Amino acid sequence: MGSSFRSSSSRNEHEDGGDEAEHALQWAEIQRLPTFKRLRSSLVDKYGEGTEKGKKVVDVTKLGAMERHLMIEKLIKHIENDNLKLLKKIRRRMERVGVEFPSIEVRYEHLGVEAACEVVEGKALPTLWNSLKHVFLDLLKLSGVRTNEANIKILTDVSGIISPGRLTLLLGPPGCGKTTLLKALSGNLENNLKCYGEISYNGHGLNEVVPQKTSAYISQHDLHIAEMTTRETIDFSARCQGVGSRTDIMMEVSKREKDGGIIPDPEIDAYMKAISVKGLKRSLQTDYILKILGLDICAETLVGNAMKRGISGGQKKRLTTAEMIVGPTKALFMDEITNGLDSSTAFQIIKSLQQVAHITNATVFVSLLQPAPESYDLFDDIVLMAEGKIVYHGPRDDVLKFFEECGFQCPERKGVADFLQEVISKKDQGQYWLHQNLPHSFVSVDTLSKRFKDLEIGRKIEEALSKPYDISKTHKDALSFNVYSLPKWELFRACISREFLLMKRNYFVYLFKTFQLVLAAIITMTVFIRTRMDIDIIHGNSYMSCLFFATVVLLVDGIPELSMTVQRLSVFYKQKQLCFYPAWAYAIPATVLKIPLSFFESLVWTCLTYYVIGYTPEPYRFFRQFMILFAVHFTSISMFRCIAAIFQTGVAAMTAGSFVMLITFVFAGFAIPYTDMPGWLKWGFWVNPISYAEIGLSVNEFLAPRWQKMQPTNVTLGRTILESRGLNYDDYMYWVSLSALLGLTIIFNTIFTLALSFLKSPTSSRPMISQDKLSELQGTKDSSVKKNKPLDSSIKTNEDPGKMILPFKPLTITFQDLNYYVDVPVEMKGQGYNEKKLQLLSEITGAFRPGVLTALMGISGAGKTTLLDVLAGRKTSGYIEGEIRISGFLKVQETFARVSGYCEQTDIHSPSITVEESLIYSAWLRLVPEINPQTKIRFVKQVLETIELEEIKDALVGVAGVSGLSTEQRKRLTVAVELVANPSIIFMDEPTTGLDARAAAIVMRAVKNVAETGRTIVCTIHQPSIHIFEAFDELVLLKRGGRMIYSGPLGQHSSCVIEYFQNIPGVAKIRDKYNPATWMLEVTSESVETELDMDFAKIYNESDLYKNNSELVKELSKPDHGSSDLHFKRTFAQNWWEQFKSCLWKMSLSYWRSPSYNLMRIGHTFISSFIFGLLFWNQGKKIDTQQNLFTVLGAIYGLVLFVGINNCTSALQYFETERNVMYRERFAGMYSAFAYALAQVVTEIPYIFIQSAEFVIVIYPMIGFYASFSKVFWSLYAMFCNLLCFNYLAMFLISITPNFMVAAILQSLFFTTFNIFAGFLIPKPQIPKWWVWFYYITPTSWTLNLFFSSQYGDIHQKINAFGETKTVASFLEDYFGFHHDRLMITAIILIAFPIALATMYAFFVAKLNFQKR
């Protein structure tokens, strides 16, 4: 066998005898190496070494980026054919020496899954009232009282075998249990679901193996870190997943080849060895996966997110697949992996999976929504599900026969996959009834499932399951029994490398934080400047305030760590579930790499402030202060990271973080001295990091020699100051404090690690179900199905299209010589791209006409969405050239927004309103006022019925991928929201992506109905079935680079398109029953252009079709005789008052249904006030010394500042979510920015009032303030205005920053100024005159002024203040500058702050747009 291989190898793979001899010598050299080196050495081409050809011996672990790229390019030039050849060569090599691929047979018997749902009366909406009831019910449940719950069956007694070496397709309508089945089989089912039955891999139960490492589950949700590139994401996954059995297989193959004297193909040997080495930072397998999934073109592009430009949606979907298949697992469970991909790309991916399954004997189980016929034909087996049951599980060739036996037949031009998903639907089954002479009665899913089990195929499955799997036949490397693929030290290195990369990518955040810290330090040192600070008891109080302020600044500087941690948790939980790495390997790098950051920032603060403020000028004490501040900063970021891991969501974590900050402040011993705290609460002082910082810093300063001057009381000045604050400790407490801070850091990081290890993903929440829905599921399901008109097997228009007509003006849109450029990304410049601009659209000319439904198609990255954005005026960056006209007149964006609709690909909606409310809101704002309200409501209900949303009209929209509507329901809602606006021109970006065949047909029928009324409709579309594709009238086809290669009619059965391309020499003819959309994309691909040496764009530009289109564009670019340009009396459909009312209505509903935001802050205010009330119990009237007054002022200062901070931080996340929705609505011309902003501002008022009332009701009796009506009123007023300021500050910050993270960092700068200039740390008379103006523009200073002036400004009780006897009122005037006779002026100034912030918010919302398109 060896000699025959060598001879054939010589003939086929070596150019001449000399080369063969040289290779033989080089191979002999490799074979003489020790085993370890031999498995890492191979022959590769001499790339880039002059003109010298041949091969060289290299270590495959040291291949450079260019060598890896050229090696893959040589192996795979044309993906479909060359990938097949590569896999076959690998298989032949292994078979030659008798080595087999490992394989896995997956069995599941009588599998069932149930979910425990809470049953609620009425609508299952998370209102504030319902949430309060849930809290009460949870408490009852803990006490043993049974609550109203029901178990809902997701899967019911399903059985089957997923065989290796076969490609299996999972089909079924949304909600039938497909995802649950895939998760169950892959061992990734949520813990809160009850699972029964048996699942086995090669006869081993899931509890005997590690299913997450034996198989790979690929989710339908694309969760990735936005700051990493495509290549980095896949490389990290490859590194964590390891190489599995590849190393052992390679070792065995190499050993047997050496024993047999066989010389392998050098390219195959190099490839196999390179992908068999574990732990590499850069893997050749990554280059291979990038190539076969078409991601090589965006390998160095950042993934991006909604607010950061990155790869496209289709590329993200492929990246999700790539991230998992780069690993070594032999069983793949893939959930809707082709959503958002064009049919050609989808076909290519399925083809590659088929090759992997057939040649490497892999087990591949794929769920798809709309598989095109050619993709469907690639599968070997079909699993059809409905209502949690299996209707069919067997060979693809037999599925139609099964349904024919059941009395149903697939029409001639109907895709089989579409037929299978519709024939099990009660609404659509009748149209496929085979026996036309007999009446049709619905054949239920139960009946079909039982009939399948009675057939021979079903009996064979039962028979196979009854026989135990022969475990002795299992390949030793098939199953994984280890939780992790690499040694934990290697996984730790991988995680620390990624964390360092992310820190570099987020350098702006850290630079901004440092700049902010420097600014705060400059303010602090110039406020507390040494030239104004004497060594006496009064200024000793200022020194103490300054030390305390330093700890607070460094504490607040850790807040951004909370938001950055929360943002990455979803990716962490995904990778943790897939056993990429242990939680500690993720947690420790996040901790260790922040040490230099804490060191640097605390050093900057100490260096800037220490000598300028005038602390004791001894280097030893400078160093000791720096060490305490370093420990404080490191403890702070550890604490906030810990909070983020426990509370997981942005709003909850921010609320908890604010509460912890408040607790650390109040128990720090500054606002209330330790000696004045109630005895049973003093423990809070000793578990507080700020307390230890305060002790360490004060002992370090006030025990210095310069503070040892004896006082009349025979106590040193330093001891007197320490005693007044309850901090009279000896010097050894410095080291105790430093040790305690470092100990707390260890505790926080330990809790952080434990939380990551044991807490579930934040997406796992308890489901709710209404009593009506439960009754329907349990017994009256069939009766609840409305008698809707069935879908025909083709997309037909409604018999009465006129019912969709509301007054509108048909409009034509023409565009000529359209070009679009963007600045070249930095990543491309680094790859040698020298142009300044990157062209995404090139010389696009065309027209879209009324009543004509146009499809805009092209492969991923061809510029389809870009063209829509340019035409719709939605691009916020880049450079546009060319001319766009509307019915002959140049497009004016303001008026165009009134007559156009845009269905975005990303389905952005307000999460807290229902489906029907979303439509009513859109209709009310976008339909003209001449249409009366009754007609609008009827039209809304008509659209609900047309898009088949009436059954879920009361469902909450929810957050995509987390709660609320499913993907296909959200897509239909996106379409409905635009249709209900009755536009003349509608742009739809992939309206059928994410929908199953039936839902796609529903949407397209609605779109066709609307087009028939005379509207102009353009849709980008990726994977159309034959019937959806042929529902369009015209087609615009783009190639990569944004160049047009076809624009014209489709023709009957796509005849015009087929004829055009088949007339081009060399283009392959379309096969019978083949999808024209897929064929068209295949024959115009880049590989075909290269093979035929032609440019389809150039051919189109030289064609008669192009000339005819150009003439048509010229004709349509001229206005009709007597026509006039679009003109409206006002910019928006509704007047300002109607806009405000509509926005206020929606926001009021959203707030009422957002308990995570509103209930959290209301609860936070109550708990904070209660804790302060306990700690400062009855201190309000115990005013004997200035310290007693400071204590009471400290209580109000703490509540004013920290309740406000909590409001601001928790509001940021909520406002950012709504801002994304606002961008979409503003682009649609729904309202003015001022109407939206005012509605947002007004909606806050009742909730702020509730918080303020809570504050007064709790604080007043507990602290014991003077309880007259005027004093209570002014206290309520002061807190109300203060909280308005903080909430409106959050709105303002969101309006001026690009994302939540930057806003979170910027807010801490405001908090710093609000703190230092509040008049508590340093009273107004002591603030230097160059800074006193800042006191006047700080709202917290006026809040404290109003509160204390009203409360104590008229109290003439005498007190001992710094050794003098004064009245309370005179001390407030002299020390703080608070005047009782200026109450009204103070009140007016205070209310001006929220008004100013709200006005700035409205201004910047209108002027700034951070959405990059």
From Swiss-Prot:
May be a general defense protein. Residues 490-702, 1138-1352 form the ABC transmembrane type-2 domain. GO terms for cellular component: plasma membrane. ATP 2 binds at G858, I859, S860, G861, A862, G863, K864, T865. Residues 11-21 have a biased composition (Basic and acidic residues). Residues 1-10 have a biased composition (Low complexity). Expressed in roots and stems. The gene is ABCG33. PANTHER family: ATP-BINDING CASSETTE TRANSPORTER (PTHR19241). ATP 1 binds at G172, P173, P174, G175, C176, G177, K178, T179. Induction: Induced by 2,4-D, but repressed by cycloheximide (CHX). Residues 1-21 are annotated as: Disordered. Belongs to the ABC transporter superfamily. ABCG family. PDR (TC 3.A.1.205) subfamily. Keywords: ATP-binding, Membrane, Nucleotide-binding, Repeat, Transmembrane, Transmembrane helix, Transport. It comes from Arabidopsis thaliana. The chain crosses the membrane at residues 509-529, 546-566, 580-600, 626-646, 652-672, 738-758, 1157-1177, 1189-1209, 1245-1265, 1276-1296, 1302-1322, 1330-1350, 1385-1405. It is a multi-pass membrane protein. It is found in: Membrane. Its main location: membrane. InterPro entries: AAA+_ATPase, ABC2_TM, ABC_transporter-like_ATP-bd, ABCG_dom, ABCG_PDR_1, ABCG_PDR_2, P-loop_NTPase, PDR_assoc. This is ABC transporter G family member 33. Residues 140-412, 813-1065 form the ABC transporter domain.
